Each structure stands twice: as structure tokens, then as C-alpha cells.
């Protein structure tokens, strides 16, 4: 299990990350672009689950490079990573933190950061 405090520490290890709030929830951004954020389910999200039980516990949304990367992330971590209809066509995955170990969210945060970071900053980071 991963907590939001651990997510905050992982995000803070990346260059030029700012932690703030979006819609009252924690969010992490680089150059003004959010790459990860706390994403509780809305009433509409809950209704869309119908008779199925929604994933429980804290949910983290993480940007990905594109929809192909989204599908790859979902396939690689099917127990912890998922999506909902609200995210159809949007390059982001959801992570059920109670089912995640530290490594996949750390890698996904880095990928999300790379998707949102200015090219120069991303290039410098990758050159390390």
C-alpha cells in the first residue's frame, strides 16, 4: 500500500515539482501542468459503476504520454491501475493506492512528470 504522503515524497524527488490543490485535493505539477492528483470518485462516477463495487481507498490520477501509454500502463499493473468512463480518451490512469506497491507508482509519476515537463527540463533529467 502507498499513501498520499509517500506519493508527495516521490513527486518531490523530481525537479521543479510544486505541490498544490486542485478542486480541494492534493495535486503535483511541473511548469504549471498537473501530472498527478488525488482523484476521489464523484457521485456520477459511483453511479457509473452500477452494481459493481468501486475501487476503495485513496485514488491517485497520473498523466501519461498518450493513449497508447495508458493502455500499456493498465495492462502492466491491472491490480492497481485502472480507468473509468470519465477518463475515456484522456491520457491518464488511476491508481488504487491500497493495491499498489511503491515501484509502479514511482515509475508512473516519473512518466507523468516527463509527459508534462518542459522539453529542456525533461532532457536534463533523462541525461542524469
Which residues make up each language-model segment?
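Charge-dense, helix-prone N-terminal extensions
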Residues: 1-128
Amino acid at each position: 500500500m502507498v499513501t498520499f504522503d509517500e506519493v508527495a515524497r516521490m513527486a518531490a524527488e523530481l525537479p521543479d515539482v510544486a505541490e498544490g490543490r486542485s478542486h480541494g485535493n492534493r495535486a503535483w505539477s511541473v511548469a504549471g501542468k498537473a501530472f498527478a492528483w488525488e482523484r476521489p470518485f464523484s457521485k456520477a462516477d459511483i453511479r457509473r459503476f452500477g452494481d459493481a463495487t468501486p475501487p476503495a481507498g485513496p485514488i491517485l490520477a497520473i498523466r501519461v504520454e498518450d493513449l497508447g501509454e495508458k493502455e500499456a500502463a493498465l495492462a502492466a499493473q491491472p491490480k492497481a491501475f485502472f480507468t473509468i468512463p470519465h477518463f475515456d480518451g484522456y491520457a491518464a490512469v488511476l491508481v488504487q493506492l491500497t493495491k499498489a506497491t511503491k515501484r509502479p507508482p514511482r515509475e508512473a509519476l516519473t512518466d507523468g512528470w516527463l509527459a508534462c515537463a518542459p522539453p529542456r527540463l525533461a532532457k536534463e533529467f533523462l541525461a542524469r
